[in-house]
Amino acid sequence: MIQTQSMLDVADNSGARRVMCIKVLGGSHRRYAGIGDIIKVTVKEAIPRGKVKKGQVMTAVVVRTRHGVRRADGSIIRFDGNAAVLLNNKQEPIGTRIFGPVTRELRNEKFMKIVSLAPEVL
């Protein structure tokens, strides 16, 4: 569960390393975001010569959370950390590579590009 002020790792090669959630999109008083939800983030740590710079405000989709996601069969998939993939204005990933596993829930959320780039889909 991601909320305002949550720090996330970036799971792509856009140039950002750490981002902070500044808003959960999808409702005026929505408090938490889970896997597949879109959030507004600010870049807190970036590598030199990357596509994004420190301080930029971006849109991102949550791909991994410590809280995890519950499946219909009752199983829960949890991860060691929280991670997001940065998006452009057309809701497409900025990076060309995705690092680490992602869940099948992203397939329903119109993020097939992220699922196809990911090395492992759980």
From Swiss-Prot:
An example molecular function term from Gene Ontology annotations: large ribosomal subunit rRNA binding
InterPro entries found in the cross-reference section: Ribosomal_uL14 (IPR000218), Ribosomal_uL14_bac-type (IPR005745), Ribosomal_uL14_CS (IPR019972), Ribosomal_uL14_sf (IPR036853)
Keywords in alphabetical order: Ribonucleoprotein, Ribosomal protein, RNA-binding, rRNA-binding
SMART domains reported in the protein's UniProt record: Ribosomal_L14 (SM01374)
SUPFAM superfamilies hit by this protein: Ribosomal protein L14
Pfam families registered for this protein in UniProt: Ribosomal_L14 (PF00238)
GO CC annotations on file: cytosolic large ribosomal subunit
Record bears the keyword Ribonucleoprotein: yes
Claim: RNA-binding is one of the keywords in the record: yes
GO biological process, one term: translation
Family per record: Belongs to the universal ribosomal protein uL14 family.
Complex and partners: Part of the 50S ribosomal subunit. Forms a cluster with proteins L3 and L19. In the 70S ribosome, L14 and L19 interact and together make contacts with the 16S rRNA in bridges B5 and B8.
Main function: Binds to 23S rRNA. Forms part of two intersubunit bridges in the 70S ribosome.
Protein name (database record): Large ribosomal subunit protein uL14
UniProt source species: Pseudomonas fluorescens (strain ATCC BAA-477 / NRRL B-23932 / Pf-5)
Organism phylogeny: Bacteria, Pseudomonadati, Pseudomonadota, Gammaproteobacteria, Pseudomonadales
